[in-house]
């Protein structure tokens, strides 16, 4: 292991001892459980949010008129309510002269695959990719486990981490993207979404409510117009506009915020050996093992160490990108996917093309290419140990 990686592991990723202790504790919540240590009031908020997360919407309450599904949990089921899934959504746009155009005239960049049907003389059907698009990408559904911990990481930590990478691992250095958070109106460092395009759990929840189900709120009041045809919205049967107050997204946010991180398997000898290889070949340069929350009024989120195996920064992934620009991220940049909970997934990478962890590693390009090549050069036993480690997360 080079001195550079020793420094990296020592300052930002010293997870070997910590993981061994945590995985051996036997006291972790199960998939889908709330964080440990919640007060009765917070536990009630978690349960109310979970019930709302599972509750289906209908056209009269604001569903659609074009949408992707009727309830959050329809897409978030893997492992437990709040998990990911292999379902894919479609994004599109147009690139000319190296500049990404989101084709806003079609209400881009997300295809809403379903419509609410016939109302007031209009047959609302699912959308299609417009012929003007020359970039089409698919994205699988990310799990929500542990996102309250991610939300509670101070912005300054992510900025410092990006600077640390620039100083010590410049070839793989990520970017901390600063954006205006819709829910708070404040400048935040993005950390959610495939492009780190969202800064807080509340904005994430409200954005999904509008984008995936078409439910408008004061946070996101823009109605989904089928293929961008706003004239059709006059036939929308929704009874209020916005369709919802901000209450429901806040309830979703309660569920997500208090949802525990994925439990990790007890560490075998092979997994421990694999962890050393994981650190040694540079995986941890981006898939940072350990993070810590800042001061928080919720004790379960207050200065807690957790193990996401992501730096929550964006990196230039070369050919392993989706081409979709989501400001401030470019089409080339993708967020480092957290590896916690990897063992229950059945597809990997943003578009689900990889069906095994090994395939996902071998598909790395751009700033992930060097680590990919080091993995490819390992002996088969070393590869097996590394994969055993990732499958313990």
Language model regions located:
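Hydrophobic alpha-helical segments of integral membrane proteins
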Residues: 11-22
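Short, intrinsically disordered low-complexity segments
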Residues: 3-4, 17, 90-93
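Periplasmic c-type cytochrome electron-transfer domains
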Residues: 21-393
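Bacterial N-terminal signal peptides that target proteins for export
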Residues: 2-13
């Amino acid at each position: 292991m080079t001195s550079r990686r020793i420094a990296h592991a020592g300052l930002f990723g010293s997870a070997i001892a910590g993981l061994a202790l945590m995985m051996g504790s036997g006291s972790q919540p199960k998939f889908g459980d709330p964080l440990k240590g919640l007060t009765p009031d917070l536990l009630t908020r978690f349960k109310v949010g979970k019930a709302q997360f599972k509750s289906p919407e209908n056209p009269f309450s604001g569903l659609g008129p074009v949408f992707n599904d009727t309830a959050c949990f329809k897409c978030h089921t893997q492992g437990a309510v709040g998990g990911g899934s292999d379902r894919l959504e479609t994004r599109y746009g147009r690139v000319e002269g190296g500049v990404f155009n989101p084709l806003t005239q079609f209400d881009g960049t997300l295809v809403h695959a379903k419509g609410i049907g016939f109302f007031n003389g209009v047959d609302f059907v699912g959308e299609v990719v417009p012929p003007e698009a020359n970039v089409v990408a698919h994205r699988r559904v990310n799990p929500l486990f542990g996102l309250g911990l991610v939300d509670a990481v101070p912005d300054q930590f992510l900025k410092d981490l990006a600077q640390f990478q620039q100083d010590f691992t410049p070839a793989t250095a990520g970017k901390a993207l600063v954006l205006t958070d819709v829910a708070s109106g404040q400048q935040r460092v993005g950390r959610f979404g495939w492009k780190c395009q969202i800064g807080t759990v509340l904005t994430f929840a409200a954005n999904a409510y509008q984008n995936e189900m078409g439910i408008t709120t004061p946070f996101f009041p823009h109605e989904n117009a089928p293929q961008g045809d706003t004239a059709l919205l006059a036939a929308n049967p929704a009874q209020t506009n916005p369709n919802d107050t901000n209450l429901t997204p806040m309830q979703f946010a309660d569920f997500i915020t208090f949802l525990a991180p994925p439990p990790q398997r007890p560490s075998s000898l092979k997994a421990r050996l694999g962890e050393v290889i994981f650190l040694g070949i540079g995986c941890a340069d981006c898939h940072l093992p350990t993070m810590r929350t800042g001061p928080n009024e919720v004790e379960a989120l207050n200065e807690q160490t957790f193990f996401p195996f992501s730096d929550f920064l964006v990196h230039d992934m070369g050919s392993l990108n989706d081409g979709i620009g989501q400001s401030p991220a470019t089409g080339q940049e993708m967020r480092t996917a957290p590896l916690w909970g990897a063992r229950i997934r059945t597809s990997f990478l943003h578009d689900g093309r990889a069906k095994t962890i090994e395939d996902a590693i071998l598909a790395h390009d751009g700033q992930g290419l060097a680590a990919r090549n080091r993995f490819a050069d390992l002996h088969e036993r070393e590869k097996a140990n590394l994969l055993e480690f990732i499958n313990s997360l």
